[in-house]
Amino acid sequence: MVAIDDADISREKAALRKSVIARRNEMNPAVRAQKSAAICREVVEQLETTFGQAGSASGKQPLVGLFSALGSEVDLRYVVRHAQHVGWRIALPVMVLQEEAPGYTMLFVDVDYKTALLRQEAFLAKPAKNLEPSDFDFERFPLVSPDELDALVMPLVAFDSQGGRLGYGGGNYDRYLPQLRENCWVSGVAFDEQCVPRVPRAGFDLTIPQVIHA
């Protein structure tokens, strides 16, 4: 019975994913850019408040996990430019084959501002691209452990008002979120057009503390 329920949930997710991505793709590019800017401003405001409350006595630069937009996702380059202005470090995800884990694993690596803004590297131009360890320059882009992140901004396919979130189906963030520190600031970002009445949820699906949307 459980297997049937899980299969039903998977089918429901797939249908919702296809529908919402199509709706997001149909947004006017100018409107999408305006909304991305509004979302980024709110992200920056909340991060400034969070990092200000944490204090800067240690002189440690906050490390913020972001993402390079895939297709019609929210464009976070405004946040990157602000990070450059105030001195926050940024980390971005890359999909790399790991010997100790089956398949490809989402890792975060330290990325310089110029590279993040230009998005010419393969793992930024095509964020879903799977890479072999030998194909990735870990010396140029050092690995960041989850407990190093002070904040994480996540992409979403769909979300609801109860904390439900729908991704692309790989479970990457479901596996990554439990590895973060308890005091790591976490938020999803999405357009209002991606909000749905209810995101189908299986037992292993994690909710998200908040979604910044416009």
Where are these regions (language model features)?
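Surface-exposed, charge/polar-rich loops and edge strands
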Residues: 1-11, 15, 22-25, 134-152, ...
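Conserved alpha/beta enzyme-core scaffold
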Residues: 90, 152-154
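Conserved residues at the C-terminal ends of beta-strands
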Residues: 67, 155, 214
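Short Gly/Thr/Asp-enriched flexible loops that form oxyanion-binding sites at enzyme active sites
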Residues: 75-81, 163-177
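Short glycine-rich anion-binding loops that position phosphate/pyrophosphate groups of nucleotides
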Residues: 70-72, 157-161
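N-terminal active-site beta-alpha-beta segment that forms phosphate/nucleotide-binding
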Residues: 2-144
